[in-house]
Amino acid sequence: MKKYLQQLYEGIFTNNPVLVQLIGMCPTLATTTSLNNGIGMGLAATAVLICSNAVISLLRKFIPSKVRIAAYITIIAGFVTAVDLLLQAYLPSLSKSLGLFIPLIVVNCIILARAEAFASKNKVLPSIVDGLAMGLGFTFALCILSSIREILGNGTIAGVSLFGENYEPMIMMILPAGGFLTLGCVIALFQKNLKKGE
């Protein structure tokens, strides 16, 4: 149990896919304009990570090494399709807001990296925990970034107005330049605090 808790801690903090490993930048920058988008993208990726890690771990001895990447992408694509269809059916506004970035989870570096580096070499339960840990780390990073960008760029959080009618939002924060600026500042602060804790 302690091993799994350590895995969770590492996935969220010391080995965070976005804030430490710097992978998955495309959806990170594109979908963090609002907290709802950040949560939606993070949870969708987490579900795909958990399921794909489990299946890849189960099939690791049967997948020939020469076609392993193609096999991983096929497995991941199946779960992404399921998540996309569920979002379209039950959360159509979120699905529309995230647009093309849900199908692009198929080639997300985080998911492919965990399939190759962890799930293909470990048993099912540790692979599921790894998927959960990395997914929560991804969601955590997206929530921080999207909260900052939405508050400064719109004056809202999860669509709820914070400052009233007179607030002049910093429109740049919801544009790509604001995404890069916020990401750089958050990474710097996060890594500085990690080094203090060591």
Write out the residue ranges for each language-model feature:
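Short amphipathic alpha-helical coupling elements at transmembrane boundaries
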Residues: 7-10, 14, 57-61, 126-134
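Hydrophobic core segments of alpha-helical transmembrane domains in multi-pass membrane transport
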Residues: 25-29, 45-50, 77-84, 106-112, ...
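Structural signature of hydrophobic alpha-helical transmembrane segments
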Residues: 35-51, 71, 95-106
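Transmembrane alpha-helix boundary signature
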Residues: 82-97
